[in-house]
Amino acid sequence: MSKAFASQADLDVKQVSFTKLSDNAYAYTAEGDPNTGIIIGDDAVLVLDTQATPVMAADVIRRIREVTDKPIKYVLLTHYHAVRVLGASAYKAEGCEYIIASHDTLDLIRERGEQDKASEIGRFPRLFQNVESVPPGLTWPTLTFTGKMTLWLGKLEVQLLQLGRGHTKGDTVAWLPQQKILFSGDLVEFDATPYAGDAYFKDWPATLDNIAALQPAQLVPGRGAALTTPEAVAAGLAGTRSFIADVHEAVKAGVAAGKDLNAVYKDTMARLTPKYGHWVIFQHCMPFDVTRCFDEVTQYPDPRIWTAERDVQMWKALEQ
C-alpha cells in the first residue's frame, strides 16, 4: 500500500475544547475528532453521541460535571457508527435511563452493527486505544422514533428530527427551537472531510436544505469546531454541500466516460485534493467515499456493508 490504511497513522493526541453555546448547550470538540453535544435541561442532561469508548466518554462526563450535577438521563445516537456509540455504557452510572435513536438507525445496528464495530476498530486505532473498556456486544437503543420526537427537559424543548438521508439512512439531528441551536451529527462537518461510505449522495443536499430551513443561529457539526454565528453555520453547510456535490459530479462524469472504479478514484482525488486536501481525515475518507458514490451511481442504491476484510481489499485496490 502506498499510504497507511485509514487512520492507522493518525496517532497524535487532539486538544479538546468544551464550548458553551448557551446556558443549556455545550459542544465537546477535539480538532476534527468526533464531537459530542450536551444539552442541559431543568432536571436532566441529554448527551448526543457517546465517543468511541467508555474511557473517552469519561472525559466528556468529567467536563459535564464541571457545569452541572443533573443526571445524564438521555443519550442520543445521531447514527449507528461505532466511533459514535460504543462509549454508551459509561453514562449508565451517571443516571442514563434512555438510549434514543431513529428506528432507521436501529435497523442499521441490527443489519450491520457487528461488522461496523470490527471495521471501525481497525480504521481508528487511536480512538479505540482503550477498546478493552467497551463491553461485549453492541450499543442498543432503548427508545426509537420515526420522523420526529420531542423531549421536554423541564421547560426546555428538544426536538429530535429526521430531516432526510445523507451520512446514513438513519441520521438524527437535535434542535433547540427556543435558542435556534442545532446538533447535526455527521450530516454537517467543518474543516473535516465528510465520511460517505454509508451515504446517499443524491439525497444529502436536500437534507442540508432542510437543516438550513430551520435557520440555526449556532450549529455543532459531527467533526470540527462549534459554529457559533449564523455566518459560520452557513459556511459549514456550504462546505459540506460543496464536497458532497463535487464527489458526486466527479464520479458521475467518470462513470459516463466508461471508466472503472480505480480510474474514477484517481480522477476524483486529483480533482478534489487542491480544494479539500487540507481537511481532517481527507486521505482516510476518500477511498470509502468514492467507492460508495461509484456504487450508488452504477448499481447499488443502498450502501453495501463494510467489513474489516472489505475495507482492506478496497484500500489495496485503490491505493496500491
What residues fall within each predicted segment?
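Divalent metal-coordination and catalytic microenvironments
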Residues: N24, I39, D49, I64, ...
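Core dinuclear metal-dependent hydrolase active-site scaffold
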Residues: T144-L176
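Conserved beta-strand hairpin/beta-sheet module of binuclear metal-dependent hydrolase folds
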Residues: F18-R63, T172-D186
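Divalent-metal (often Zn2+) His-rich catalytic cores of metallo-beta-lactamase-fold enzymes
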Residues: W175, D203-A263, D267
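Active-site neighborhood of phospho(di)ester-bond hydrolases with catalytic His/Asp-centered motifs
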Residues: L48-T50, K73-H81, I100-H103, L163, ...
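C-terminal regulatory/interaction regions
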Residues: A256-Q320
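Active-site HxH/HxHxD metal-binding segment of metal-dependent hydrolases
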Residues: R62-T150, K169
